[in-house]
């Protein structure tokens, strides 16, 4: 899956840390494996700082790590749970059933 993100303001964010409002580019890859906290600690121990962490009311969440100097982009580590799996099942369903009419689909 490719996720396209557009930030419609200049507020500070993990995306604005890398690109200003007139710039665009490849921001991050997302990884969904193992225990989130353990994986973040492993990356931190390797010298990659946690930049942003969040968790939604539904229990979805992630941590962005600063891996730009090493690999050219940030790395996102997901919290893997039923809510995340359901979200991506909905994304897949929307893609498979897309009628070609709307470029933006609200899920």
Describe the role of every protein-language-model region.
Residues 1-49, 59, 66-107:
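Glyoxalase I/VOC metalloenzyme domain signal
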């Amino acid at each position: 899956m490719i996720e396209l993100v557009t930030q419609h303001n200049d507020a500070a964010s993990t995306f604005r840390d890398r690109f200003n409002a007139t710039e665009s580019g490849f921001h991050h890859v997302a990884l969904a494996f193992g225990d989130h906290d353990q994986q973040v600690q492993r990356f931190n121990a390797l010298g990659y700082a946690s930049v942003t962490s969040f968790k939604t009311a539904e229990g979805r969440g992630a941590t962005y790590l600063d891996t730009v100097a090493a690999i050219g982009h940030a790395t996102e580590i997901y919290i893997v749970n039923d809510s995340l799996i359901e979200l991506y099942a909905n994304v897949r369903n929307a893609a498979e059933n897309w009628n070609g009419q709307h470029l933006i689909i609200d899920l």
